[in-house]
Curated annotation (Swiss-Prot):
Membrane topology: Multi-pass membrane protein
GO CC, one annotated term: plasma membrane
Species the sequence originates in: Vibrio parahaemolyticus serotype O3:K6 (strain RIMD 2210633)
Annotated InterPro entries: AA_Transporter-Related (IPR052576), Na/H_Antiport_NhaC-like_C (IPR018461), Na_H_antiport_N (IPR032813)
Keywords recorded for this protein, A-Z: Cell membrane, Membrane, Transmembrane, Transmembrane helix
Disulfide bonds: none
Protein name: Uncharacterized membrane protein VP2115
């Protein structure tokens, strides 16, 4: 059996049994190494060698958590939440409440999508924006599984179809380049997003299904410090609001300039400190709260990097892709389906759709040409196979990001309330729409 398939299946089974994700990743990595014939020592060494790859992201999450706590202390998030609650209180009818609910969802989609291209900060905004809005979600009785689906949609769909920001990297720098390198020299940049429109429609279908069918019923959460918006008026320090705005601008500007979430969050935090929002003696407590809020996400990222390192070391990814080409026969529809399913397994094993393309394109492009798939169909196959698994993977930042914000009060479970809903609503439609694209383009 292929070690990647075994490892991914073991990881998913353990995670679904509510075993801690870090434990599930570590154990399944060891299982994969042993299945591949590696010694226990070599497997552990490969796992440990990969841990450093997740350290940067883990520290980024810790700093973002600290920055989020600092923002909440300024009162700017209370101001934002109260403005929404004020609108809600003035409109008690069911129709008005429903309208406001959909307005909030649309706003979240737009903000999340803009984080991929307009202001390319990726998931950095989630731990900052979402925790203060938990009170609004509770007031509107929004199911957080729906919010997770909305956020994941906004994180993935833009890079699949829009060639700007992270989409420019995915579609042009990685997908187009690897298509050229593996035999599709005549494909031009304008064809790539066009070919990905139908798979992108699958993402839209999944989002609409989540909003109007799966999670349309109201859901109530326990009252906590984060889910209760205090409606009693108290004076808001205007200077603190100004400092908060400057801190957010500073964090964003520094991150875009340096390319580092760590330095960006640090710059924003220092603005809050020098601006008087946080006293010097409180900095330790604020940092501790921020790290506590983001610690589990950070450790999952570190363990995921180790897991990916073992998967690459086993050689199982290449073997899995190559075995596909020898087992299909002449069945074109089956070939398209199996290519997508293998892409799903590889992306869930590696944890990054961006890293999956070079692995898949090496075999998929010649295989697609041999089966007579058109260049547009080949683009759709490779692009969709890579994007598959980004949603619904326990170790993907497209699921860890939403959980980091929604679980700020401990009422949102990563596997059953982010991973499983996004897997069902996005991976299944992506397979269906990706397969249709391969057949009709």
């Amino acid at each position: 059996m292929n070690p990647v398939v075994i490892s991914v299946c073991v990881m998913l089974v353990l995670a679904l049994m509510r075993v801690n994700v870090v434990v599930a990743l570590t154990f399944s990595a060891i299982v994969g190494g042993l299945v591949a014939g590696m010694s226990l020592g070599d497997t552990v060494a490969a796992f440990e060698s990969g841990l450093g790859g997740g350290a940067t992201i883990a520290l980024s999450y810790a700093m973002l958590g600290t920055f989020a706590v600092a923002i909440s202390k300024s009162g700017i998030t209370d101001l934002l939440a109260k403005s929404v609650i004020k609108r809600l209180n003035g409109k008690e009818s069911a129709a008005s409440t429903t309208g406001l609910k959909y307005a909030v969802l649309v706003a979240l989609v737009l903000v999340t999508m803009s984080s991929q291209n307009v202001i390319p900060v990726h998931i950095a905004f989630i731990p900052i924006l979402i925790p203060p809005l938990l009170g609004v979600f509770a007031k509107l009785k929004l199911d957080r599984r729906l919010i997770a689906c909305v956020l994941t949609f906004g994180l993935i769909t833009p890079y699949m179809v829009l060639p700007v920001g992270f989409g420019g990297i995915f579609l042009n720098n990685i997908l187009l380049k690897n298509l050229h390198d593996n035999g599709l020299e005549n494909v031009v940049a304008s064809q790539v997003p066009t070919a990905m429109l139908l798979p992108g429609a699958g993402m839209i279908f999944g989002l609409l299904l989540a909003i109007f069918v799966s999670y349309r019923k109201p859901r109530e959460y326990k009252e906590t410090e984060l889910t209760v918006v205090h409606e009693t008026d108290h004076s808001i320090n205007k200077q603190h609001i100004l400092v908060a705005a400057l801190g957010i601008i500073a964090a964003l500007g520094v991150q875009l300039y340096t390319g580092s979430m760590i330095i960006g969050a640090l710059a924003g935090f220092m603005v809050f400190t020098f601006g008087g929002v946080i006293a010097w003696k409180e900095t330790h407590d604020v940092f501790t709260k921020g790290v506590h809020m983001m610690a589990m996400i950070g450790f999952i990222m570190i363990a995921a990097a180790g897991f990916a390192a073992v998967m690459k070391q086993t050689g199982g990814v290449e073997t899995l892709v190559q075995s596909l080409s020898t087992s299909i026969g002449d069945n074109k529809p089956l070939a398209a389906l199996l290519m997508l399913v293998v892409g799903l397994l590889v992306t869930m094993g590696i944890g990054s759709s961006f890293s999956t393309i070079p692995i898949l394109a090496t075999i998929y492009v010649p295989l697609s040409l041999a089966f007579g798939f058109s260049p547009m169909a080949t683009i759709a196959l490779v692009g969709t196979a890579a994007a598959l698994g980004d949603a619904g993977s326990p170790a993907s930042d497209s699921t860890l990001g939403p959980t980091s914000g929604l679980n700020a009060d401990g009422q949102h479970e990563h596997i059953w309330e982010t991973v499983v809903p996004t897997f069902i609503h996005y991976n299944i439609p992506l397979i269906i729409f990706g397969w249709i694209a391969a057949m009709v383009l």
